[in-house]
Regions:
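The substrate-binding groove and active-site-proximal loops of carbohydrate-active enzymes
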Residues: 23-33, 71-81, 295-298
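Loop/turn elements at helix/coil->beta-strand transitions in domains of secreted/extracellular proteins
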Residues: 46-52, 68-72, 95-100, 228-230, ...
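Short alpha-beta junction capping motif
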Residues: 67-115, 311-314
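Generic beta-strand/beta-sheet core signal
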Residues: 54, 75-76, 103-104, 236, ...
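Solvent-exposed loop/turn segments at secondary-structure junctions
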Residues: 58-61, 78-82, 106-110, 116, ...
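Glycine-rich, aromatic-lined ligand/substrate-binding cores of catalytic
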Residues: 118-306, 310, 314
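Aromatic-Pro/Gly-enriched surface loop or interdomain linker
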Residues: 1-67, 309
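Short, glycine/acidic-rich beta->alpha junctions
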Residues: 36, 65, 80-86, 266, ...
């Protein structure tokens, strides 16, 4: 607002000029959100996959019944804002045996509540913690629409790693990096994912978003925070710059030299994971916001494209 306070309530009916193809966001070295998601739909068309596009509002209103129509569900690059009904649908879909591919980072992070009578209106409170552009004033952390505590889902006991196996760990808006395969990728349960990819091959050192498949915002594998113990760590990013910083909700003290950037902080990384879920379901997630920007490199003939195509064909 003009007085400097944050906007907690908004509507999709108002013009949103940065939600259009080819818009370059001021934070990103390339594309962001909707226009970055078009990298994925372009790739799906190029590889002749049949697909439907559904919105967050569709999922909120229809729930898991919507997802149950599909053997495999993919997210876009930045599914940051989720309602309680959306999280419940994602979780139930996995329990039902659905195959889920989480292709973003910083997912399922902020509590988002639709107006009970008008789904065109949504409320998001930026609470006392989180990587955020503004902070609600004291006493204004609870939602007006349902009275429940707002802010981060982890504050309500639903940290993203319990939904998608990964948790938001770092962000930086300069250049993107690449992955190196981890020992789990060579196990019989996982090696098929890397058909056509060498054991020592660098993965994703190219792309339209920052020049690499691991960038902008990153998620990590963390058993302490709820990553399933049956999850396989397939690959891990490396060589991030010192402008890639750990998320501030995990910075306990602002002590000089204690928390560093990408060259010295082990929490600054993207982790690629795969695991089985009940009823013959499974989940794959590369843990990076810029991942889909690498799919079209070299006329779609590259190791990022190969990995996702192999995974999707199996699912």
């Amino acid at each position: 607002h003009s007085d400097g306070s944050g906007v907690a309530i908004s509507s999709r009916l108002r013009p949103i000029f940065n939600m259009r193809p080819k818009y370059r966001h001021w934070l990103s070295p390339s594309l962001w959100q909707l226009n970055a998601d078009l990298h994925l739909t372009d790739w799906l068309e190029e590889k002749n996959f049949d697909f439907d596009v559904v919105t967050d509002e569709d999922l909120h209103l229809e729930g898991v019944e919507l997802l149950n129509r599909y053997k495999c569900v993919l997210t876009g690059s930045h599914p940051e804002y989720s309602s309680e009904k959306m999280l419940a649908a994602y979780e139930q879909y996995q329990l039902n045996g659905g195959r889920w591919i989480y292709l973003g980072s910083d997912g399922f992070y902020w509590i988002s509540e639709y107006h009970p009578d008008n789904p065109n209106i949504i409320e998001v409170r930026k609470g006392e913690a989180g990587t955020r552009a503004w902070t609600a004033n004291p006493g204004e952390y609870n939602n007006a629409f349902d009275g429940k505590y707002g802010g981060m889902w982890r504050a309500r006991g639903r940290i993203p790693s319990k939904v998608c196996g990964l948790t938001f760990t770092a962000y930086g808006f300069d250049v993107s990096s690449y992955y190196k395969r981890s020992p789990d990728s060579k196990r019989p349960e996982c090696s098929w994912i890397f058909d056509g990819v060498g054991e020592d091959e660098v993965i994703g050192d190219f792309g339209l978003v920052g020049g690499g498949a691991a960038g902008l915002e990153l998620d990590r594998y963390d058993l302490e925070f709820g990553t399933p113990h049956n999850a396989y760590l397939l690959a891990r990013s490396e060589n991030h710059t010192n402008l890639m910083m750990q998320v501030n909700e995990e910075i306990h003290f602002t002590v000089r030299g204690y928390y560093g950037g990408g060259t010295e902080n082990p929490m600054v990384r993207a982790d690629m994971i795969y695991y089985k879920t009940p009823n013959d379901g499974a989940l794959f997630a590369p843990g990076s916001l810029s991942f889909c920007g690498s799919l079209s490199y070299n006329n779609y003939n590259n190791n990022v494209s190969k990995i996702l195509k192999t995974q999707l064909e199996d699912f």
